[in-house]
C-alpha cells in the first residue's frame, strides 16, 4: 500500500482522529499578553463560526482535526469559510486544508519516503510543521509503523 503524507502526519498528530482538538494555552497566553492577534483572521473566524470574540480567540489558538491545523492557519486569508464543526466532520475539508498548508509553507516536495530516509529533510519539515526538532522523531516512528522506507 502507498502511504501519503496525510497518513504519516495524521498518525503523529491524532492517530487519525478527524475530531481531535487541542487548545494551546501557552500560545493563547502569549497572544493575550501581547495583544498580538491578526484581526482579519479573528474576523474570518467570527464570521464562519458566528461566535463571540473570546470563542474566536480560542479557535485561533487551537489545533483541529486529524493533522491538527491551527485555527489561525485554517482561517488565514478567508480561504476556509465554514465552521470548525464542519471541518471536524469532513475528511475532505481536512485534506484540502492540509494541502493548502503544505503549499503555503513550501512543504509539497516532501514524501513519506523522503521523510523516512532523509533526516535533514525530516528535521526541516518538522520545524516548519510543528516547530520542534523532536517532532522529526515522531515522523520517523510513523514512517516505520507504516513500513515506509
Swiss-Prot record:
The keyword Hydrolase applies. It is found in: Virion membrane. It comes from the Viruses. It is a peripheral membrane protein. Keywords: Antimicrobial, Bacteriolytic enzyme, Cytolysis, Glycosidase, Host cell lysis by virus, Hydrolase, Membrane, Viral release from host cell, Virion. Belongs to the glycosyl hydrolase 24 family. Endolysin involved in host peptidoglycan digestion after permeabilization of the cytoplasmic membrane by holin. Involved in host cell lysis and liberation of progeny phages. Displays strong lytic activity against chloroform-treated Gram-negative cells. This is Endolysin. It comes from Enterobacteria phage PRD1. The gene is XV.
